[in-house]
């Protein structure tokens, strides 16, 4: 059962995330359809009318969400940390940009110069908030909310990792394996023969025959006769067949266990949707809290690991492991084709993400990344 502080923390985080997503949606619409300028509903776009109607409907919905979020978060602004305050500033920018137009008189009055600079007024307001008798309680409440957010995030991370893992292992050991072993003799498709298992069995049988002859030569005994050798090979062949039949069911067991783990993961996500929103805000704060050099280092590490010049060996090991896990033959042609195409597609998507998103959110990180890569 959640405490009052945790529930309040979840509410604030949920409101902030909804407003932030709405503000990002408006920014995306501005960039894609209005040339990175404010959206003008009366402007006719060079798109079908149905698409423009959908764009305007999304825009009005997102603006309303931003306004509601702004009004809900504004009284608790002192409880926000630096990352959350950055999100709130984006929401405030959107709200001010699309505020309802006032009359000409009020507009002329609003354009009148302020008697004092806004920076000085902001400093006075900051000092006033610090001298406010309730400022200490507000700071403590903000600290508690961030602490609750961290605890909730760590809890949901552990649940997302441990629950599927435990369900997979326990279902495979206590439910799936006994059921498959019991049904396999009567259902041949559960233990269908696999070419790679047959090849391994033939190779083991050949090695077994060579070992018998080698042991006889080492001990100085006579080489077993053809009949004795035939009997030993028949016994060994039956053992290898039983082992191959058991191994052939491993793929079915792995698939069923993975499905059970996937269902458990989806169940955890469904019943903890509010906690997942808190986790998203926590991860955003952790990522955006990194310095530009740390962000660039993480990006270079990720790209070199998955799309770098030395990544084919890692992809080959990964694909072979996946094929063995699901009982598929590790086809060399498919692996080479995958390595030749997928990292290129991944690198293209990553460069597009840098161009479209990271260049707007953190241009200094992009500049640092280019400097660390040695590009001009």
UniProtKB/Swiss-Prot annotation:
GO molecular function terms listed in the Swiss-Prot or TrEMBL record:
proton transmembrane transporter activity
Membrane topology of the entry: Multi-pass membrane protein
**Annotated TM spans:** 150-170, 251-271, 299-319, 334-354
Localization recorded for this chain is: Cell inner membrane
Coiled-coil positions are none
Where the protein is mainly located, per its record? Answer: membrane
Source superkingdom:
Bacteria
Keyword annotations of the record = Cell inner membrane, Cell membrane, Hydrogen ion transport, Ion transport, Membrane, Transmembrane, Transmembrane helix, Transport
Q: One GO CC term of this entry?
A: plasma membrane
- Asked whether the keyword Transmembrane is assigned, the reply is yes
Q: Which InterPro entries match?
A: CemA
Question: What is the documented function of this protein?
Answer: Required for H(+) efflux immediately after light irradiation to form a rapid H(+) concentration gradient across the thylakoid membranes. Together with PxcL, contributes to transient H(+) uptake following dark to light transition.
Entry-linked HAMAP family: CemA_PxcA
Similarity remark: Belongs to the CemA family.
What this protein is called in its record is: Proton extrusion protein PxcA
């Amino acid at each position: 059962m959640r405490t009052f502080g945790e529930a309040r923390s979840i509410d604030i985080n949920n409101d902030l995330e909804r407003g932030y997503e709405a503000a990002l949606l408006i920014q995306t619409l501005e960039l894609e359809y209005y040339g990175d300028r404010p959206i003008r509903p009366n402007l006719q776009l060079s798109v079908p009318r149905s698409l423009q109607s959908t764009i305007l409907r999304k825009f009005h919905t997102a603006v309303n969400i931003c306004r509601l979020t702004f009004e809900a978060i504004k009284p608790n602004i002192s409880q926000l940390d630096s990352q959350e305050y950055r999100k709130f500033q984006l929401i405030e920018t959107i709200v001010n940009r699309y505020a309802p137009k006032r009359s000409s008189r009020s507009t002329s009055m609003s354009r009148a110069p302020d008697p004092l600079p806004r920076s000085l007024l902001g400093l006075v307001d900051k000092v006033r908030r610090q001298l406010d008798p309730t400022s200490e309680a507000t700071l403590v409440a903000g600290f508690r909310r961030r602490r609750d957010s961290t605890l909730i995030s760590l809890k949901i991370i552990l649940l997302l990792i441990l629950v599927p893992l435990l369900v997979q292992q326990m279902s495979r050991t206590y439910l799936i394996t006994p059921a498959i072993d019991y049904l396999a003799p009567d259902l041949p498709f559960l233990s269908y023969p696999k070419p790679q298992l047959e090849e391994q069995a033939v190779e083991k049988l050949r090695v077994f025959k060579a070992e018998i002859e080698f042991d006889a030569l080492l001990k100085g005994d006579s080489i077993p006769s053809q009949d004795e050798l035939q009997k030993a090979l028949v016994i060994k062949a039956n053992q290898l067949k039983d082992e191959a039949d058991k191994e052939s069911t491993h793929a079915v067991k792995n698939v069923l266990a993975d499905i059970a783990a996937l269902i458990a993961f989806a169940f955890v996500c469904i019943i903890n949707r509010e906690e997942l929103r808190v986790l998203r805000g926590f991860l955003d704060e952790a990522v955006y809290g990194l310095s530009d050099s740390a962000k660039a280092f993480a990006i270079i590490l990720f790209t070199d690991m998955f799309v770098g010049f030395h990544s084919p060996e890692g992809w080959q090991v990964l694909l072979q492991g996946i094929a063995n896990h699901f009982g598929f033959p590790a086809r060399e042609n498919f692996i080479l084709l995958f390595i030749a195409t997928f990292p290129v597609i991944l690198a293209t998507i990553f460069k597009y993400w840098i161009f479209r998103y990271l260049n707007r959110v953190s241009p200094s990180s992009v500049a640092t990344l280019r400097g660390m890569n040695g590009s001009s």
